[in-house]
């Protein structure tokens, strides 16, 4: 938590250094428990009239190339790892996360592997060995070919097949709940989780 609070202030400073106006107090007023995310920053800066002509933000305004999901696209473009407003945070390892999920009665599933594997499907083998029990084969981020590929991988590894749209409300306005490419009755997937 302390890391996230410190990172919030650093992200705001880094966005300012990029030449984008941001009211830190307004960002903090939108933040749950004081944690400012890249999406919150995007919402604040894109609604600030002083940024209306900022060339860095033009792609996120209506009609822009990144306007389909402006808040999360801003995050990916400026606040994700390797980007100008990225701030490193130490998280628990995947192995620890999987163990914690299992210990608390959950089912560890690899979400949107088409993105999370970053084009390196060979990583799946090591992730399976860490103990995941399922894979989100159906994802709004996947093409039909990727859906089929991850279904095949799930079957080969004996993993549960899940699906998700990655709906996040206003953060991803072009992503709709339940829209993730499942071409069959999803009850078999649901029943497998019981």
Range-by-range predicted roles:
Residues 1-117, 121, 187:
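Extended substrate/RNA-proximal surfaces in nucleic-acid metabolism proteins
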Residues 91-106, 110, 114-194:
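Charged catalytic cores and adjacent phosphate/nucleic-acid-binding surfaces used
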